[in-house]
Amino acid sequence: MRLSLAGLVVLALALVRAAPIEPTELHSKAAQGLRLLDLAEDAEPVWKTEDEKLELMRAGVHFFDVTETYEIEQQIPKSALRAPAATFPAPSQQTTVTRIIATLSTANMQASLTTLSNFNNRYYRSSTGADASTWILTTVRSIISGKSGISASNFAHSWGQSSTIVKFAGRDTSAPVTILGAHMDSINLSSPTSGRAPGADDDGTGTVNLIETLRALVAAGFTPATPLEFHWYSGEEGGLLGSNAVAANYANNGVRVKAFMELDMTGYFRPGSTEVVALEADYIDTGLNNFLKQVVTTYTRLPVTMDTPCGYACSDHASWFKYGIPTSMPFEAVTGNDNPRIHSSSDTISQSGFSWAHSLEFAKIAVAFAVELTS
C-alpha cells in the first residue's frame, strides 16, 4: 500500500497534460495489446505494455487500467464526479442486525474459502480465474433460489473473468442503491497467469464475508426498503478493472448510489499486534467513515482506528469515489500489521496471524452496513 521510489518517478512522468485520446488511437493501441493506465489523480493516462504494467505492480504502484472505460468516462459530466460530504444516521436497527449476525457461520466461510483457494489461481486472465467467477455466480444463485425480488447476474468483461452482481430490488425501487463489494481475483506477482495464487486473504476473505452476509440476510427473510447490491469484482489486481467498469457503467447510466463499502482483506493481523478494524483514510467519505465507526462499536467486539492513507487506486472503493459516491473500506489491520504474504503462493489460512474469529467481525460489519442503510 506504499509507493516505492520507482513508483514516484512513474507518477511524475504521468503528470504531463495532453489532449484527450482520439478513438482511433485508443482502439488501435488496444488492438496491439497496449494498456491505458491512470497513475495519479488529475494526470493524463499513459500507454504501457502488459510487461510494463506487471513491473508497475511489482514496484507497488497502484493504478486504474482504463483501457475499456476511457471512452465512457469522457462522456460522464465532470459535475457528476464529485459529491458533497454525506451524512448518515446513527445505527438504529439493533434488533434486526443482532438477530442476523448471530446466524453468521465461520464454518460456511471456511468451506467457501477452501473452494476458492483450491483454484490454482483466480487471476482475471486465467482459465481458473474464469472458473472461480462461474463458481461464485452458481453459489449466490443457489442462495437466492426461489426468492422474489432478488437476482444474480454476471457483468461481462473483455477478459475471461466476469464480475458478479446480486441485486435486492427493495420496496422503493427508485431510491439510491447501497453497495457492498469485494474482489474475487488473486495474483502471484512472480507468475500471474500460471503461478499458484490461493489468495486466501487477498481477497478470499472479503469474498466469503459477502457470500455469508448474503446467505444470512436471505435466510432471515430480510427485505430492504431501498435497493441493496452485492458485487464481486473481477480484475482488481490488474488495475481495478472490474469495479471501474461497473462504476463507470452505473455513472454513465445515471444509477444513483447511496454508499459503497469494500471488504478487501479481513482475515489477518500480525501476531502480537492489537486486533482492530482499521478504516482507510483516503479516497473515502468522512461521513460514511463516521457512520462505520459507530457500526463497529455497536456490532463488533473490536476497537476501531484510522489507517494511514493507502494511496491512489489502492482498492475497489477508489472506483466509486472518483464518480462522487460516498465510499469506505474497513481493513484487517493498520498498515504494517497487515498480511505480508499476499500476491504469492503463501497467502493461505495456515500462516500464523490468520484468524477466522477476526474475519467474522467484518461479516458483522457487512450485515450492519446493509441493514442500517437500507431499512
Please provide the spans of the model-predicted regions.
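Solvent-exposed loop/turn segments at secondary-structure junctions
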Residues: 121-124, 157-161, 170-174, 184-188, ...
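Fungal secretory targeting signals
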Residues: 1-20
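Active-site-adjacent substrate-binding region
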Residues: 269-375
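A non-catalytic alpha/beta surface segment that caps or lines the substrate-entry region
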Residues: 111-169
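Acidic/histidine-rich catalytic neighborhood of metal-dependent amide-processing enzymes
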Residues: 160-163, 194-287, 291, 316
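Primarily auto-inhibitory N-terminal propeptides
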Residues: 18-84
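N-terminal hydrophobic or amphipathic helices/low-complexity stretches enriched
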Residues: 69-126
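Second-shell loop/turn segments in exported
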Residues: 95-104, 118-128, 150-154, 192-203, ...
